[in-house]
Amino acid sequence: TNDQGKIVEMPLAIQLKEFEIYEYPPKLMLVNGKTGDPIPKDKPATIVVDSTFKTGELQGWRIKLNKCIDEAAPLMTRDTTNYLPWHSSGAVTAINITATSPDGKVKKTGWVTCGSYHFPYQVLSLDGKISIAMPEREPQRYLSRIELMTQAGLHAFADIEVNSPLSVEGWKIYQLSYDTSMGRWSETSVLELVRDPWLPFVYAGLGMMMLGAVFMFLSLQRRKETKE
């Protein structure tokens, strides 16, 4: 829509073919078992569970990794909840760990997940007062794979990524956002289209200024050589 709220037909059409998010490795942290506040509250302590992680420590608790499933779904029985690989929309990152207290008297084993729009998160309760939780995984980069058609007859496929806009027929198409409630399973991509009709004149002006500087430099050099 324009400034008057009227619908304006764009000179190009965009169809989203695929949206991809690449996330940072999952993290584990301690939280208050009653309030859910991170521990420490001001500067939460975390450990990164990447491909090299085996053991770590959170506020004195020793954490041992038993299993990590990047895309999983819960399998619930009467007494337990297990996680199995599940490569479908809404899958969660599930980590099975064993946590041992600083004095070695308490040992807990269980699953921790960050949850998704489809499944709730799961924490591992340690001593009734604190639990181990997994915060939402942070996006490292995300991009849209699009099909583009213009009134001028252009038909192309392209990738648009944050800080890597697509330029086409005087337009710049930026990757702006996505449906954060769906996370990496988002089926919506937010793009921003920007057109500056004065941009070619700006570039032309800059080019003329650069040429003028070159000619001025050459002219000064010739005058200097003539005097010598």
What do these predicted ranges mean?
Residues T1-E228:
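Solvent-exposed, non-transmembrane regions of integral membrane proteins
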